[in-house]
Amino acid sequence: MMKLVTAIVRPFTVEKIVNAFEDIEGFPGMTVIDSEGFGQRMRTSAYDTLDPFKPNKRIEVAANDEMVDQIVEAIKSHAHTGKKGDGIIFVTNIENAVFI
């Protein structure tokens, strides 16, 4: 079965994550999308009340089950800074994929 790994990460971590993916044998490819959002947090300034959205990147990888743990670990180890807001990773089942 195939899985979709979706990660929301800080923009400056993407290059390190891509480099880590290059070390995974048979890595299937990825999509990187500019996005904005916010998680559970307290507002820290007047600016936050005007525009709570922070820029981030969404990384999507469709992969076989056997590769998912490697992909998730590569993201976790290269996106982690230890600060709140480092991101989140979702792993979901892919019901069907159709090449165009």
PLM region spans:
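Positively charged, small/polar-rich N-terminal and surface patches that mediate targeting and assembly
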Residues: 1-100
